[in-house]
Regions:
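Short loop/turn motifs at secondary-structure junctions and domain boundaries
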Residues: 7-8, 31, 70-71
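Primarily EF-hand calcium-binding motifs
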Residues: 8-19, 34-44
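Alpha/beta-hydrolase superfamily serine-hydrolase fold, recognizing
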Residues: 16, 40-41, 59-250
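Acidic Ca2+-chelating loop motifs
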Residues: 19-29, 42-54
Length: 250
């Protein structure tokens, strides 16, 4: 939903309506939106009209419940790392109140997946909890702009701005900026891999945030099934047409 909210519903509809017949078929929808097709097609005629599309986007929504944190963890939520008011450019920070050492702790930074077109930082809490619960690590989970709002390289610019922000605030929050691991799955895996190999690439650094004096190098990368070779990704058997103009990779 956050991916779509940055655009006017009519603009989204027009972009998805590839044959310009004023209706959306399942094949015209992005992969992540197809699961909602039957919910949007209220008259069950096998296509989505502009009125149905707008009504669905304007429907009342229940706020998502945040996973509860274990006792002994201090959470700092929705911290802006890019000096903007965009919720997609925020991170959550998790600090153990009882630490296993007096020295600054290493930090694990989680980057969510979702095909670069959906996903949210809150999905990282369950994965990070065992580490900061034990008092051995500080944890962070970041949002980044999705492809429906900004195209590449905005995503890596955001991730690097988040890393710089964390380094600039390491002393304040008591973690070791030189022992920073990044962990992600799928699209998040791609982004952490990019962080690992592009620490010295100025073209991918971006100019976001107030911590331009910091670099975006990391000391450890944990890439869970992140795509790496986009030119050949469509050559392997798959239910997804990776070379389609509507694919996340495109």
């Amino acid at each position: 939903a956050s991916c779509l909210s940055a655009k006017d519903p009519k603009q989204i509809f027009s972009e998805w309506d590839k044959d310009k017949n004023g209706l959306l078929s399942p094949k015209e929808l992005p992969r992540n939106a197809r699961t909602n097709f039957e919910r949007v097609d209220t008259n069950r005629d096998g296509s989505i009209s502009l009125a149905e599309h707008e009504a669905f986007l304007k429907r009342p929504r229940q706020p998502r419940k945040r996973r509860p944190l274990p006792e002994g963890i201090k959470s700092l939520l929705n911290l802006s790392y890019a000096n903007t008011d965009n919720p997609r450019q925020t991170l959550d920070l998790f600090l153990p109140e009882k630490r296993r050492q007096d020295a600054p702790l290493p930090i694990i930074v989680y980057i969510h997946g979702g095909g670069w077109e959906n996903g949210r930082k809150e999905s990282g809490i369950g994965k990070l909890t065992p580490y900061f619960k034990a008092g051995s690590f500080v944890g962070a989970s970041i949002n980044y702009r999705l492809s429906g709002e900004s195209i590449w390289p905005a995503q890596i610019h955001d991730c690097k701005a988040a890393i710089r922000w964390l380094k600039g605030n390491a002393e304040k929050y008591g973690f070791d900026a030189e022992r920073m691991a990044v962990w992600g799955n799928s699209a998040g895996g791609h982004l952490v891999a990019m962080l690992g190999v592009s620490g010295g690439v100025k073209a991918l650094e971006g100019k976001l945030g107030k911590h331009s004096d910091q670099d975006s190098r990391v000391s450890c990368v944990v890439d869970f099934c992140g795509p790496t070779h986009f030119l050949s990704i469509g050559k392997f058997p798959s239910n997804i047409d990776h070379d389609s103009p509507n694919s996340p990779e495109s």
